[in-house]
UniProtKB/Swiss-Prot annotation:
The gene is CYP76T24. This is Cytochrome P450 76T24. It comes from Catharanthus roseus. GO terms for molecular function: heme binding; iron ion binding; monooxygenase activity; oxidoreductase activity, acting on paired donors, with incorporation or reduction of molecular oxygen. It is a single-pass membrane protein. Disulfide bonds: none annotated. SUPFAM superfamilies: Cytochrome P450. Belongs to the cytochrome P450 family. InterPro entries: Cyt_P450, Cyt_P450_CS, Cyt_P450_E_grp-I, Cyt_P450_sf. Its main location: membrane. One of its GO terms (cellular component) is membrane. Keywords: Glycoprotein, Heme, Iron, Membrane, Metal-binding, Monooxygenase, Oxidoreductase, Transmembrane, Transmembrane helix. Pfam families: p450.
Amino acid sequence: MDVDILLSLVLAFFGWAAIYFLTSRLSFGKRARLPPGPYPFPVIGNIFQLGQNPNQSLTKLAKTYGPLMSLKLGSNTTVVVSSPAVAREVLQKNDQVFSSRIIPHAAEAHAHHKYSMVWLQVSGLWRNLRKISKEHMFAAQRLDASEGLRQEKLQELHDYLVRCSTSNKAVNFGQTAFTTSLNFISSTFFSVDFAAYGSDSSQEFKDIVWRILKSYSTPNVADYFPVLKFMDPQGILQKNTFLFSKMFDIFDNIINERLMMRGSLDTSKKNDLLEALLNHSANNESEFSLNELKHMLLDLFLGGTETTSTTLEWAMAELLRNPEKLERVRAELHQVIGEKEIIHESDISRLPYLQAIVKETFRLHPIVPLLIPHKAEADVEINGYTVPKNSQILINVWASGRDSGTWLDPETFSPERFLHSEIDMKGRHFELIPFGAGRRICPGLPLAYRTLHTMLATCIHNFDWKLKDGMKPEDIDMEEKYGLTLQLAVPLNVIPVKL
């Protein structure tokens, strides 16, 4: 296309967009009162005010405009919630109206948004998938039955760290935790390990997961201006189509191999989640197809690996910076489980300080700082303002966790604040909702609760930790790397010392 023609088309589009933006803003102002917020620039709105770390930028803006704030991101109205009280209004009192999702263009790869528990609108299919996940994956009885597999993975983690300790080898703590999380899930689902410690395959899988999660949070012109979706201007949909294909190829190979085994004379039978889901699919193919199974597996691997490992890395970084708290939880572990190397999941309830450390880590470092965006299905009045239909709702749990009106010394890592508190992470106490709340709460919370506590306990109870090159604990870089998940910008490399 001739450059002059292309330039004219671009100018014409943005001229039209500017007129549309201004007139729509004025017309809406006549019929509804939006929550306060920074005045938007023509066309682009407040996009550039998000910065490199939107959770931090939005928290600063909320100090000026309040806990219920509106912005214009391109052509989309976005409402940001930054306090526990307003979060309760949205996710509890008005849960039904706000239970839908804003679909990022990145999630449309392989039509994932049409089959995903994460992105589906509340519907019969969504309810069926939630029911399957609850009954076949995360029910207490099924998790109890598969604890032996997780115990094996904890022992493998322990043995790997012993080898590193013997050779005085530093480990990338987040990468090590990721490998354990990945094998937790793959062994529970497929009876196989996807990775070995220190292997390239583990890093490759982690890179794929991170790139997909990053695509969901990368500012995307196609999301800000949906009329441009057909162009995929940043190539995000194309990249995700490739990444999803790699994940689906892995799942296809495993599923096909299992189906061949089931159809052969092989009498050996796996007692894992895949077997249960294949049985359910065979008996209810109209309700749960193999295609839906693959999309469900994609959600589970994305949601259950990076989130767990990143939370553990934040927890260990905070404990190394606060050695007196590390010693306190180690003493608790020694008192409760004694000389055992591996903690049992039934021990967690007897370890209140360990639980407090996990809660405090989530308070300061929520793994999904803005949760997954919600969508308003109708105009709703909250705190005297109108949240308009089809607007995007962001719940800034990072801001809620650092709210001085809710927490004493909010910037200080202090697990003690939870020792005599009824606050839990199950979506009932809006001061701490790292897994969300309401009907959209993360279905994997029961498994995450078990794995986080047992993995952290294994690392603390059996090992001391020292930093490389004489680095002091106070020198650990706690800067954030923003994505759909919130990571340490500089990976934590530490040397285990066997106790």
